[in-house]
């Protein structure tokens, strides 16, 4: 897809030719950009949040847009005000779009909408929690049809924006909806079930009977659910298990973007005898996985388990130890809700996505068949309710 910034380059080139031909010396200020579309998760050019430092959403909406520069007068690519164009914007929580975990999984769902539905897409990376509302408004004021907000912490800002912009559909990833709002779908997951499966795998693979979990902050309910499920699953299959679970001590602004702390905490767990470590905390958890992968015995006597997505695909540095991942199927969940919005059937309230374990990949032959069979039985029990994780969100 062409980026909106190409219009600026083309305009400047045309102006330079005209000025040279006419012998003029004055220059013309180009119109300000609005959020641009992209094919790639990472942009080198100015981002919408950088633009926000210079103008409010309302000012950006009033300024000239790339569509207004279309010399043929038609709806140019990027014309989100056109009913013929589906525009989808994504706002991350504090952290990068390429976190190789939570944010990236949601963005992949948006990119799938670009490929399969012809949507024009863009993201904004949040750098400060105080920017939530303004980042959402950047998309809303520029005519975006669907806005995806990623993470529990954006829940309040998403509800406020949905009430302010009732004609825009919102998808709140990991945002439980206590009261349904007509234009919000909360994409939620049973993280305790995914954690239970990861814990059961760890409890059956361990030789030392000590396993660990390196986690994001307990201020985020899904992280707590992963941890509680992990511990319950391990205890379900191994009554002698010893579990070392550690939450990041920082707030939402740092708890998921601290791979150094993740690595240090994983090393401490290894030193205490843990031989299977679950990394569940965005890039912080990735640091734990990579630390285990670099340790002596990785893949033979030491294993690690990823989170949110199949991290075999996103964290290749963890391959030496990465036996599986506790997955929330965020990518298909986001895509399905975007498609529902396009069809005019976005479900209000909560939409429960699927969870499960990722494939074993290179460890397929190392995982005993008995372990695989037990995991199948546990998954079936969790689904039919005969097995419970014991996790109580209100408890």
Task: List each language-model region with its residue ranges.
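Bacterial N-terminal signal peptides that target proteins for export
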Residues: 1-9
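C-terminal motif of bacterial Sec signal peptides marking the signal peptidase cleavage site
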Residues: 18-21
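Hydrophobic helical h-region of N-terminal Sec-dependent signal peptides
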Residues: 9-15
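Intrinsic disorder/low-complexity signal
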Residues: 23-25
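A residue-level marker of the well-folded mature domains of exported/periplasmic proteins
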Residues: 27-395
